[in-house]
Amino acid sequence: MHHTAPDPTDAAADPARVTAPPGARARRRPLALALGLALPLTLVAACAQGAGSEGEQGDAAEPAPSATSDVSEAAALTPRLAITYDGGVQVLDATTLEVVDDLALDGFNRLNPAGDGRHLLVSTSGGFQVLDAGTWAEPHGDHAHYYTADPVLTDVTYAAEKPGHVVVHDGRTALFDDGTGDITVLDSATVADPHGIDDARTLTTPAAHHGVAVELSDGSLVVSEGTEDARTGVRLLDAAGDEVAANDQCPGVHGEAVAAGEAVVIGCEDGVLVVAGGAITKVAAPDAYGRIGNQAGSEASPVVLGDYKSDPDAELERPTRVSLVDTRDASLRLVDLPASYTFRSLGRGDAGEALVLGTDGSLHVIDPESGTVVRSVPVVDAWEEPEEWQEPRPALFVQDGIAYVTDPAGRAIHAVDYVGGEVWKSAELDVVPNELNGVTGKPATTGGHEADEHAHEDGEHGHDEPAHDEHEGHDHEHEDG
């Protein structure tokens, strides 16, 4: 099926800014320096309701409301993938790699996790539009019922002038608007609910910038500081919005990841900042210019994987070293690889393995504790990073113990067993894949792999030119990925 996405700029949809009702929750207090307004929610028509995380406890579980009436019950979870291409988004079955649906959507679009196991957030020219991947589970007593439906781009859009990073952590989803500095944090389970924003935590940074925010389980918030011209550091706010700690020794802030124990790592042009235990620690890079702008974290590991660039004058560096930041002692080590990589090359395995997709076509598996490359799995032909960060290049996405790798040159996608060291399934595509993301079909939960799924190069749309944080882990700036 081929759906046409509603126009997020439709004059009939007049987004209204709302703030969280007073007293609804203490954690929704705004930043001390600026009272923020809730991110506008655009409802073009009858909005699709999001999948609830709780099912009815009657004789039979009721499927969650869907944007389509074509709902089928399945025997098990049906994880799905989404890939962007020039002209739309294709949704695939993550097990068979077959195309489930093709959704038309013009423009350069980015895929972000929503955090509820069913939806994705598509960064468009109008904001963050909710994509229903059409797979979910409904708890029912001591078991669950599983459902599938046709994927659809819903009419729910969180309006943003320049949609930037999306960070999912501990059942909460944080959206950052680079054009205004507005931050909206809401329960992941309500992202697709047009009323979910009513209880959202909202705030605005003192100045608009390509930024990021991470909310932790106690309601504290790590938020970047900067302007359109320069990003300098981060602040740690408590649940009431009061400053607990701050550090302005992080030039070019970009990218974030959460490690075991809720330690947050923020990338800088000369190392990283580690936010843990209510304190912010600077970890210097071994080079005067050692940019880490894309990271991938895992709740299974205290070590965060990051990129590493050391040539401030390079237009396109093509790095061959990655960084491993140990949040236990705030230390940093570099690992040499046999090939370069890009901002879409970083991922984490279920056991915390550090995964890097190289331009040699292999998926390199690194032990984060020893820094040793334990295996390299050939996946695609050798390739070269394109000059423009928006151009398609092989991308890595890890879900449910499987590493998925796209091959734009071959118009294909591969599922890789990174533990067994083999490609177990491949499929041809009828489009040139660009971005890659997915959903498990499981309801929103706390914990899990953390990465800024909005890796970019630092430079554009959330990118800082030439440094790109792949929202990769997160370089949401042009290619400084």
List where the protein language model places each region.
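C-terminal motif of bacterial Sec signal peptides marking the signal peptidase cleavage site
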Residues: L43-A46
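Bacterial signal peptide processing site
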Residues: A48-A51
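Repeated scaffold domains used in trafficking and secretory/extracellular systems
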Residues: A67-S72, L105-H119, P151-G171, T202-D218, ...
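Short beta-strand elements that form the blades of beta-propeller/WD-repeat-like
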Residues: E73-Y85, N112, G117-V130, G164-V185, ...
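A short beta-strand motif characteristic of beta-propeller blades
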Residues: T95-L103, H140-Y158, P194-T205, G241-D248, ...
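Long, acidic/polar, low-complexity amphipathic helices and coiled-coil-like
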Residues: H145-G267
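Acidic, serine/threonine- and glycine-rich low-complexity intrinsically disordered segments
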Residues: E225-G349
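Blade-level signature of beta-propeller repeat domains, shared across WD40, Kelch, NHL, RCC1
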Residues: P408-E457, D480-G481
